[in-house]
Amino acid sequence: MNFPIERVRADFPLLSRQVNGQPLVYLDSAASAQKPQAVIDKELHFYRDGYAAVHRGIHSLSAEATQQMEAVRTQVADFIHAASAEEIIFVRGTTEAINLVANSYGRHFLAAGDSIIITEMEHHANIVPWQMLAQDLGVEIRVWPLTATGELKITALAALIDDTTRLLAVTQVSNVLGTVNPIKDIVAQAKAAGLVVLVDGAQAVMHQPVDVQALGCDFYVFSGHKLYGPSGIGILYGKSALLQQMPPWEGGGAMIKTVSLTQGTTFADAPWRFEAGSPNTAGIMGLGAAIDYVTELGLLPIQQYEQSLMHYALAQLSQIKSLTLYGPTERAGVIAFNLGQHHAYDVGSFLDQYGIAIRTGHHCAMPLMAFYQVPSMCRASLALYNTREDVDRLVAGLQRIEKLLG
């Protein structure tokens, strides 16, 4: 496979550092990905040479910054194949995007006696906002269970839907198991029953091309920092017809048309009515640079390279006798495992001494831990800059821990 891995690795300056006297092996990109120099440079350039407050400024710097920000909105729309840039809302991240939908769409369109569906594999960010909404409104939450292999059974969805069901919130790729859900089929079944569908794409957009119109979902959410972009910036996509019906969630500057102490406030059109206050303009610029970066490499070549690396990693890890792997064979991005009866924290601490960075704990997915009846797991995640040598270092580290701890 002719993927330019050496050039790619050279683009990420942090990968050259050492940790505990060892060359860094960074296997925690599912938590937050490293940043290419192009993203770092873009933010630096904006702060150094072009910074100004956006919106309504008549001076050149403000006009330029506003134009650049809106250009990124169009770029994001093109990246996920939205019908219009006006379907793209800038938020702080996936968590805020889901909370926005729950508090704007949910509180406006749902009522006591309605039901919504989530799955057993969701990140807490796609559970807790719906629980809070359900508690306040008297809405029922129904849970779509998993199979033994950590997958959703498409035919099980129909039994969860009745005439009270209004919304389905589902992840495209599990942040723990790497399960790639057949979102297009799921959305089609849900839409046939009249449901609104929110898709959590936080673990998908960096691993595969996304076309929200082809998927047919009503809302799609993701974060910049997992897409090799800055922290503190994310995206909510919403179908225009829905966004125009939704009230603002937060109030403040930039999201209004008029404000009167006697006549009240009228709000801007979507998407701007959902962007109260000063935006993370530098983060938006960096997100644009990150999208440029992965687009130049090509998401299909990235997907093919990562899938080849994933197959290699699973084959090598399966040779460790005391290691338990969780999730399906075909997956994207992440590998969850435990080593014998050793606590994930201990395994992660030992690996850190060898310069290997993984994530340990419940991964903001406590219901999934309960499903597997474990308190925690180790998670190694693969990105476009990882190599077989990284996998070999991980395997060697685990084998060393196995010998040390028994």
Curated annotation (Swiss-Prot):
The modification N6-(pyridoxal phosphate)lysine is found at residue 226. CDD domains: SufS_like (cd06453). It is found in: Cytoplasm. Its cofactor is pyridoxal 5'-phosphate. GO terms for cellular component: cytoplasm. Keywords: Cytoplasm, Lyase, Pyridoxal phosphate, Transferase. The active site is at residue 364. It holds the Pfam family Aminotran_5. NCBIfam families: PRK09295.1 (NF006791), sufS (TIGR01979). Homodimer. Interacts with SufE and the SufBCD complex composed of SufB, SufC and SufD. The interaction with SufE is required to mediate the direct transfer of the sulfur atom from the S-sulfanylcysteine. Cysteine desulfurases mobilize the sulfur from L-cysteine to yield L-alanine, an essential step in sulfur metabolism for biosynthesis of a variety of sulfur-containing biomolecules. Component of the suf operon, which is activated and required under specific conditions such as oxidative stress and iron limitation. Acts as a potent selenocysteine lyase in vitro, that mobilizes selenium from L-selenocysteine. Selenocysteine lyase activity is however unsure in vivo. This is Cysteine desulfurase. It comes from Yersinia pseudotuberculosis serotype IB (strain PB1/+). The lineage of its organism: Bacteria, Pseudomonadati, Pseudomonadota, Gammaproteobacteria, Enterobacterales.
